[in-house]
Structure formats: C-alpha cells, structure tokens
Regions:
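Active-site proximal beta-strand in glycosyltransferases
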Residues: 4-23, 69
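Acidic donor-binding loop of glycosyltransferase active sites
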Residues: 174-190, 203-204
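Helix-loop-beta element that forms the nucleotide-linked donor phosphate-binding surface
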Residues: 57-78, 82-86, 100
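Conserved acidic donor-binding segment of nucleotide-sugar-dependent glycosyltransferases
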Residues: 221-229, 236-242
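Membrane-proximal helix-turn-helix segments that form the acceptor-binding/catalytic region
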Residues: 31-49
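Glycosyltransferase donor-sugar binding loop
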Residues: 76, 108, 132-147, 161-166
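Conserved donor-binding/catalytic core segment of Leloir-type glycosyltransferases
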Residues: 93-115, 121-128, 134
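A charged, aromatic-enriched C-terminal amphipathic alpha-helix characteristic of glycosyltransferases
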Residues: 242-273
Length: 274
C-alpha cells in the first residue's frame, strides 16, 4: 500500500536488500521461506534495487529479471588509530589476553553460525602456528558458544582465546592493525562492514572465497575454502612469512579508491538528484 502512496506523490521507491537474509541459519525454515517471498515481492514494487555488492546485484538480476538495479558500495573509515604500543589501554588489554603485537590471528564479528566460526576454529587448531587466535565477539550466555566448545573442544587449545567484546573504536583499530592476520568467514552477502574495516587496517586478510568477499577484497587478500585442511594449510603457508606490509598497502589503496564514505555519499546524492 505505501508504494502506491509514494507513487501518487510522484515519488520513487528505492530499496537496498543488504544481503541474503533468508539464507541466514538463525532463521527457522518457515521464516526463511517468508523472507525469500518478501524479497521477491519487494523487487516487484521497487522502482530501483540498490545493491551494496556486485554479487548481490547479479543475484537480483538473475533471480528477478524484471528488476531495475544499480550498485553503490558500502563505506568504511580509513583513518588510522591514534594509539601506540606505549598507551596504557593497549598494554593492559594485551596483558589480559596474554598476547602481543603480531602474535595473533583475529576473528571479529557477529557470533552466528553462517560466519563459519566452527570451520575457522577447527582449521586454526589443525595448523602448526604458535600464534594465538583472538576471537572478539559477544559469546557470553550464548548457546552457540557451548555448541562450538562441544564440537571443536577449543577449550583444550591454549592458543584459542574468546576475549569478549571491545567497544573502543580506536582500540579496535589498533588491535586490527597489529593482528598478524584477520580471518573472515562471512558468506551470506553482500558487502560486510567488518571486512572493509579489516582491509582498511590489517595487512594480511584471510578471506572466505565467496563472490561477495572477492568483489570487495579483489587481489589484496588471500582466499580459503571450507574444504577440510584448506584454511589450516593457508595458515601454515602465511605463518612462515613475517612481513605483509606491501599487501596491506594494496588493501588500503583498494579501500581508498572504492569504499570511502565520501565516494558512497556522492553516488547516493547523484542518484537522488537525478
């Protein structure tokens, strides 16, 4: 009904589907079916579907060929951390975690199954690295945490450390910058803000090689598959090299060219004023 009201006012109805919500494992089958149906209906009535990832735009075009689509990316903050290794909050948090700069792989994101925590943890545990795996997420009182503990027995590997949440954005930038590598397992499209934040701060990014992630990271990351042994082998490969600063420069340049908020806002302004 509201689309008719918009059109009566000579307005346009634009939608941004974000990702493929109906694919998320947290939803029961009836809810997934409803979300998939809603996706179809919204494309019927929208004047334009704006996708934040080329993979999402391709999916919309292929699945709903009647849709008019465009691509406008998501953005990220490229400013570096103001903290140094001498700051008290930096030293305190590393002391609490019993680790230090470049001595850890990092996972940071929503604590849900479709972000492939189980695969990442299993593969890390199978690797030979002596570095830690720092996992920043809201795991307290979460049934998924106990499920993972039961399935992987990560609590028996002292390298695997669930450290809770960190809300200080400047400190998070420092933690990202000083990670030896970031492991990204998100696969339910489209452009994930956490991946952009990692590419803007972390030199080495180990990214699940689905199309949504590849279209963002391009050739500035190392990719892995969910096949058993694939990520653990990659970890062992990269672990032998200490400096990935050149790859980090390429990643930051990619973010600067394609994912700044100035660029994104400008593209939306151009669309709305056209």
């Amino acid at each position: 009904p509201f689309t008719r009201k918009i059109h009566k006012l000579d307005g346009k109805f634009y939608i941004n589907p974000d990702g493929l919500e109906w694919k998320r494992a947290k939803w029961p089958k009836p809810v997934q079916a409803y979300l998939k149906y809603s996706e179809k209906v919204m494309t019927r009535y929208a004047d334009l579907v704006i996708s934040d990832n080329p993979g999402i735009e391709t999916y919309i075009q292929d699945t709903y060929p009647w849709s008019k689509t465009t691509y406008i990316a998501y953005g990220t903050d490229l400013s570096p951390t103001t903290l140094t290794n001498q700051d008290a909050k930096v030293r305190d948090i590393y002391k609490t975690w019993n680790t230090y700069e470049k001595n850890y792989y990092l996972i940071l994101g929503r604590f849900v199954p479709e972000n492939n925590y189980e695969t990442a943890i299993r593969e890390f545990m199978s690797s030979s690295t002596k570095r830690d795996l720092i996992i920043i997420c809201n795991h307290e009182s979460n049934a998924y945490f106990e499920e993972l503990r039961s399935k992987t027995q990560f609590d028996k590997d002292p390298r695997v450390k669930f450290v809770g949440t960190v809300y200080d954005q400047d400190l998070l930038k420092y933690i990202r910058k000083e990670a030896f590598a970031y492991i990204h397992g998100h696969e339910v499209g489209g452009t994930n803000p956490g991946l952009l934040e990692a590419m803007a701060q972390t030199d080495l990014n180990l990214v699940l090689g689905v199309s949504f992630n590849r279209s963002v990271a391009q050739d500035t990351a190392r990719y892995w598959k969910k096949d058993e042994g694939n990520l653990s082998h990659l970890i062992d490969q990269v672990d032998a090299i200490s400096d990935y600063s050149e790859l980090g420069k390429l990643a930051k340049e990619n973010m600067k060219q394609n994912f700044t908020w100035e660029k994104i806002v400008g593209e939306y302004e151009e669309l709305f004023l056209s």
